[in-house]
A protein has these predicted regions:
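Domain-level signal for Mg2+-assisted phosphodiester chemistry and nucleotide/NA-binding surfaces
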Residues: 1-100, 150, 154-157
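Nuclease catalytic cores that cleave nucleic-acid phosphodiester bonds
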Residues: 78-158
Length: 158
Protein backbone atom coordinates (compact mmCIF):
# COMPACT_ATOMS: atom_id res chain seq x y z
CA UNK A 1 0.00 0.00 0.00
CA UNK A 2 1.46 3.36 -1.05
CA UNK A 3 1.39 6.08 1.60
CA UNK A 4 -0.09 9.41 0.54
CA UNK A 5 0.09 12.75 2.32
CA UNK A 6 -2.24 15.49 1.06
CA UNK A 7 -0.99 19.08 1.16
CA UNK A 8 -3.95 21.43 0.78
CA UNK A 9 -3.52 25.14 0.10
CA UNK A 10 -6.69 26.24 1.87
CA UNK A 11 -6.46 29.86 0.76
CA UNK A 12 -5.97 28.82 -2.88
CA UNK A 13 -8.83 26.29 -2.68
CA UNK A 14 -11.22 28.79 -1.07
CA UNK A 15 -10.55 31.48 -3.67
CA UNK A 16 -10.90 28.95 -6.50
CA UNK A 17 -14.31 27.92 -5.18
CA UNK A 18 -15.27 31.56 -4.65
CA UNK A 19 -14.27 32.55 -8.21
CA UNK A 20 -16.64 29.87 -9.54
CA UNK A 21 -19.48 30.93 -7.23
CA UNK A 22 -19.44 27.50 -5.56
CA UNK A 23 -20.36 28.62 -2.03
CA UNK A 24 -22.03 25.29 -1.29
CA UNK A 25 -18.56 23.68 -1.34
CA UNK A 26 -16.94 26.00 1.23
CA UNK A 27 -17.59 23.42 3.96
CA UNK A 28 -15.84 20.54 2.23
CA UNK A 29 -14.61 17.53 4.13
CA UNK A 30 -11.00 18.08 3.07
CA UNK A 31 -9.97 14.49 3.78
CA UNK A 32 -12.81 13.06 1.69
CA UNK A 33 -11.82 15.41 -1.10
CA UNK A 34 -8.23 14.14 -0.98
CA UNK A 35 -9.40 10.52 -0.90
CA UNK A 36 -11.27 11.04 -4.18
CA UNK A 37 -7.90 11.21 -5.96
CA UNK A 38 -6.49 7.97 -4.51
CA UNK A 39 -6.07 4.72 -6.39
CA UNK A 40 -6.97 1.37 -4.76
CA UNK A 41 -3.33 0.69 -3.82
CA UNK A 42 -2.97 4.04 -2.03
CA UNK A 43 -3.77 5.06 1.54
CA UNK A 44 -4.14 8.60 2.86
CA UNK A 45 -1.93 8.65 5.96
CA UNK A 46 -2.00 12.39 6.69
CA UNK A 47 -3.65 15.58 5.53
CA UNK A 48 -1.88 18.90 5.96
CA UNK A 49 -4.10 21.95 5.54
CA UNK A 50 -2.46 25.35 5.10
CA UNK A 51 -4.36 28.55 5.74
CA UNK A 52 -4.24 31.98 7.28
CA UNK A 53 -6.71 33.23 9.86
CA UNK A 54 -8.94 35.96 8.46
CA UNK A 55 -8.56 39.21 10.38
CA UNK A 56 -11.61 41.13 9.18
CA UNK A 57 -14.55 41.27 9.02
CA UNK A 58 -15.48 39.57 12.27
CA UNK A 59 -18.24 37.42 10.73
CA UNK A 60 -15.80 35.90 8.22
CA UNK A 61 -13.31 35.20 11.01
CA UNK A 62 -16.02 33.49 13.09
CA UNK A 63 -17.13 31.30 10.17
CA UNK A 64 -13.55 30.35 9.42
CA UNK A 65 -12.92 29.51 13.08
CA UNK A 66 -15.94 27.18 13.15
CA UNK A 67 -14.71 25.50 9.95
CA UNK A 68 -11.17 25.08 11.30
CA UNK A 69 -12.51 23.71 14.60
CA UNK A 70 -14.46 21.10 12.61
CA UNK A 71 -11.34 20.16 10.63
CA UNK A 72 -9.36 19.74 13.84
CA UNK A 73 -11.62 16.81 14.78
CA UNK A 74 -10.48 14.78 11.76
CA UNK A 75 -7.93 12.03 12.40
CA UNK A 76 -4.42 12.48 10.98
CA UNK A 77 -5.23 16.07 10.07
CA UNK A 78 -2.93 19.01 10.80
CA UNK A 79 -3.53 22.72 10.23
CA UNK A 80 -0.56 24.96 9.48
CA UNK A 81 -1.03 28.72 9.77
CA UNK A 82 0.49 31.53 7.77
CA UNK A 83 -0.28 35.18 8.34
CA UNK A 84 -1.77 38.25 6.75
CA UNK A 85 0.37 41.34 6.29
CA UNK A 86 -1.41 44.67 6.08
CA UNK A 87 -0.68 47.33 3.50
CA UNK A 88 -2.11 50.84 3.29
CA UNK A 89 -3.27 51.69 -0.22
CA UNK A 90 -4.07 55.17 -1.52
CA UNK A 91 -6.60 55.54 -4.32
CA UNK A 92 -5.00 57.36 -7.28
CA UNK A 93 -8.31 58.92 -8.23
CA UNK A 94 -9.75 60.25 -4.96
CA UNK A 95 -6.82 60.01 -2.53
CA UNK A 96 -8.79 57.86 -0.05
CA UNK A 97 -6.61 55.44 1.93
CA UNK A 98 -7.62 51.97 3.03
CA UNK A 99 -5.97 48.89 4.44
CA UNK A 100 -5.67 45.70 2.44
CA UNK A 101 -4.26 42.36 3.56
CA UNK A 102 -1.97 39.94 1.75
CA UNK A 103 -1.67 36.28 2.69
CA UNK A 104 1.92 35.25 3.42
CA UNK A 105 3.80 32.07 4.34
CA UNK A 106 1.41 29.46 2.93
CA UNK A 107 3.71 28.48 0.06
CA UNK A 108 6.74 28.52 2.37
CA UNK A 109 4.95 26.36 4.95
CA UNK A 110 3.86 23.87 2.28
CA UNK A 111 7.42 23.73 0.93
CA UNK A 112 8.94 23.11 4.36
CA UNK A 113 6.47 20.35 5.26
CA UNK A 114 6.76 18.71 1.83
CA UNK A 115 10.57 18.60 2.01
CA UNK A 116 10.56 17.48 5.67
CA UNK A 117 8.09 14.68 5.00
CA UNK A 118 10.04 13.54 1.93
CA UNK A 119 13.37 13.55 3.77
CA UNK A 120 11.88 11.59 6.68
CA UNK A 121 10.23 9.09 4.32
CA UNK A 122 6.69 9.77 5.53
CA UNK A 123 5.09 9.35 2.10
CA UNK A 124 5.43 7.58 -1.21
CA UNK A 125 3.11 10.02 -2.96
CA UNK A 126 2.47 13.67 -2.15
CA UNK A 127 -0.92 14.97 -3.28
CA UNK A 128 -0.56 18.72 -3.70
CA UNK A 129 -3.87 20.59 -3.94
CA UNK A 130 -2.81 24.04 -5.08
CA UNK A 131 -2.41 26.16 -8.19
CA UNK A 132 0.38 28.27 -6.67
CA UNK A 133 3.29 28.39 -9.13
CA UNK A 134 5.65 29.23 -6.24
CA UNK A 135 5.51 25.51 -5.38
CA UNK A 136 7.13 24.41 -8.66
CA UNK A 137 10.63 24.73 -7.14
CA UNK A 138 9.96 22.56 -4.07
CA UNK A 139 8.17 19.96 -6.20
CA UNK A 140 11.15 19.77 -8.56
CA UNK A 141 13.48 19.48 -5.55
CA UNK A 142 11.51 16.50 -4.19
CA UNK A 143 11.60 14.85 -7.61
CA UNK A 144 15.35 15.43 -7.92
CA UNK A 145 16.35 14.44 -4.38
CA UNK A 146 13.86 11.60 -3.93
CA UNK A 147 13.29 10.07 -7.38
CA UNK A 148 11.21 7.18 -5.99
CA UNK A 149 8.64 9.62 -4.59
CA UNK A 150 5.84 11.09 -6.68
CA UNK A 151 4.21 14.48 -6.37
CA UNK A 152 0.78 14.75 -7.94
CA UNK A 153 -0.62 18.25 -8.41
CA UNK A 154 -4.37 18.74 -8.27
CA UNK A 155 -5.58 22.18 -9.27
CA UNK A 156 -8.52 23.78 -7.47
CA UNK A 157 -11.24 25.31 -9.64
CA UNK A 158 -10.76 28.84 -10.84
Amino acid sequence: MKRVIAYVDGYNLYHGLKSKGWKRFYWLDIQKLAQQFLKPDQKLVKTRYFTTVVKQPDDKRRRQTVFLDALKTLPDFTIHFGQFLSEIITCRVCGHTYTTYHEKMTDVNISVELMTDASQDRFDIALLLSADSDLVGPVKAVQRLFPAKRVIAVFPPG
